[in-house]
Amino acid sequence: MSEQKKKYDMNSPEAKALMEEITHGTFMKEGTMVAFPTCFPGASIPIVADESHITALDATPEGIIYGGTSGHRSHVFVAMFHGATGMVFDLMAIEGATDCAAVCCGKEEVLACVNGWQDGGRIVATKLQPLPYDCIQEWGFERPSFQDYGPAFRGETIIHAVAEPASDTVIGITSGHLFSADPASSRIETLGEVPGSGRIARTASGSIVGLDGDSHLWSYAPRTRSLRRRAYVLPDGNWGKAPLLWARERQTGLLYTADGEGGLFSFDEGKGFSRPLGRTALKPVGPMAVTFDGRVFGFCGPELAKMFCYDPAAGQVSNLGVALSVIEHRRYGYVFGDAVTGRDGQIIFGENDNLGHLWLYFPKIKSAGQGRPDRPPHVL
């Protein structure tokens, strides 16, 4: 005798709550997303679909965004969203380049690290763009010339790079070496050997850290030009399953990262890694950034990523759903390549997909009294 199927009461509070979660909890449960095309709407056309996977972002102190794309060709673009601007301008399509690993804003120039050549990933640079007078009344940009610094290390792919403001240089890694690029001299210098894996980050003191095997971080101090291998021990977790990613809190320099299982941690040079802060709904953890009140926003999961928020004041990780923009035109966001914090605390995500957009996320404003702690608890 077959077992009788259990009947569900679709009018029960439990069933209604589940239906509500499925219906209204799949997409953007908190805050507002705006998907912005890679153009000046109404005045120019976006970067073509198979060249517009946004994989690298950075921002100047004034809040001007620079980015790089991957695909059939790599492009470098500038984006402005404050004042009377509201546009993305394609600065250059780089012939031969198919992958942009990083863009780094210096005091006067932006450097892009691009791959696609047999002799190794190269660095190209151009002057920063000034804030235009008024993009409503008049709009005039010229595509600037780019200078090619050459390969970062001959025969090796560039993995990632970050700006080092104190010396106005760029520190990066290839598949086997640590290097610096100096805009003042247009020179690239090899600083040592490191395993080229995942992304690197700048700490509160200005040191650069990156993954050193599956159990440690290496550390490079630009001021003393000293490289320490196996400088910091990683906490318990799965650190070889997904590329290492970071988010940096601008005010304190506190870093956030995640292991391959979606476990979140913070890192402070003096105190080491925190205890586990929480776990994301999906894995692996993708790009993330920290807004001004200390909350961390990012994406997790492959192909159909969901947004998450870690709130240090509440000490919890929440699932915010799949990215959806409903302002002016409807667009769903599934895969993202990088993230950066904007001038006013909004988070800007680069969509790593055909016809990629810049997604501006405006977090929910906290209620009065919902303060933020100075630092998350750390293991001493």
Where are these regions (language model features)?
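Short glycine/acidic-enriched loop and turn motifs that connect beta-strands
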Residues: 72-74, 116-120, 215-216, 262-263, ...
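Beta-propeller fold detector
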Residues: 37, 87-93, 134-150, 189-193, ...
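Short loop/turn segments that connect beta-strands within beta-propeller blades
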Residues: 80-84, 128-131, 182-186, 221-225, ...
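Beta-strand-rich domains and repeat architectures in extracellular enzymes and scaffolds
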Residues: 43-74
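A short helix->beta-strand "capping" segment at the edge of beta-propeller domains
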Residues: 22-50, 143-147
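Conserved beta-propeller blade signature
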Residues: 65-67, 110-113, 169-172, 207-210, ...
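Repeated scaffold domains used in trafficking and secretory/extracellular systems
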Residues: 51-57, 96-104, 148, 154-162, ...
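Blade-level signature of beta-propeller repeat domains, shared across WD40, Kelch, NHL, RCC1
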Residues: 332-380
